[in-house]
Structure formats: C-alpha cells, structure tokens
C-alpha cells in the first residue's frame, strides 16, 4: 500500500500512548469509521471531553491520516493480517491493533459497499426530444418567421436518478453546437490514439 509520509506519521502518532490515551484513541477510531459511513461528521471528533487534552493539530492530522489509511486499505481490499502487520510496523500496541481489527471486521462490508457507490459521474444523455416552433411576430417586429428548435435532453446522473435539460436554439445555434460537439469528439479520438 502506498501511503504518504504524513499518513504514516499520523498512524505512528496513534501509537503514542502518552499523547493519545486509550479513551481518545477509541474515540478517534470510532469517529473515523462512522465519518466514512456518514453516520457522524468531522465535528463529532471534538465532542468528547477527553479530546480536549490532545493538541488540536496533532488530533486533526491523526484523524485525517487514519481516514486515508482506512480508505486505501478498503480500496485495495487489504486482509486483516496485512492491516495488522502494517500497524505493527508503525509501533501500535497489540491491544490497539486488535481494537482497530475489530472495527475493520465490523465495518468492512458496509464501507466497501459505500465506496462502490461513492463516485462522481457527469450526467449522461439518455434521450433527446425536440420540437420545431416558428416565431411569427414579436412586439418589435411585425413579421419574424424565425424557426426555433425546442430541445429537451433527458440525463442520468447516477443509478435511476434522471434529470432534464431544456433549451431553445435557432438553426445557426444548433449547427454551431453540432460543430463543437464533432470537434470535441475529434479531440478525444486524437488524445486516445496518442495514449
């Protein structure tokens, strides 16, 4: 697992029983797992009175480092023994390693499921409806006779989450849009050939 120096320092800070006593340690671990599952927020970290004795900067660094550690180990699906070995390398006591291992056992499935649906996708166009309208006249001009296309795009953001994009365009604007889309397609094809 490739972890940055900051993350490794944060994990080593968890091993310092003088800086982080057992009650603070348990609170940090509990909060980390529940923040990932969105059952708690980061501000809940400071709700415990025992945390007030710990340096705020060290607490925040340790908290963020352990969140990264959890996410990275879940992302590559590290097994319990690998997690224990890594924590042991960074000087955590066996009781603390066991405590963390129990949380991994308890929340592994839920976190992996949560990570599988936690991603960002641009909306995909799944349907297009259009209608041709004709503006006959306006307040300023007696006769206009301009064709206008009313376009409705149905998009899909995530699983079964649909949205709508509606706009009106003249023939020139529509041709310009088609030209720009074709240009973008060519650029993507060129970049995929290069790589």
Swiss-Prot record:
Record's subunit section: Component of the commander complex consisting of the CCC subcomplex and the retriever subcomplex. Component of the CCC subcomplex.
Gene that specifies this protein: commd3
InterPro entries: COMM (IPR017920), COMMD3 (IPR037355)
PANTHER family the UniProt entry points to: COMM DOMAIN-CONTAINING PROTEIN 3 (PTHR31159:SF1)
Family recorded in the similarity comment: Belongs to the COMM domain-containing protein 3 family.
Name of the protein: COMM domain-containing protein 3
Domain COMM: 124-192
Function: Scaffold protein in the commander complex that is essential for endosomal recycling of transmembrane cargos; the commander complex is composed of the CCC subcomplex and the retriever subcomplex.
GO biological process: sodium ion transport
Top-level division of the source organism's lineage: Eukaryota
Lineage, broadest ranks: Eukaryota, Amoebozoa, Evosea, Eumycetozoa, Dictyostelia
Organism: Dictyostelium discoideum (Social amoeba)
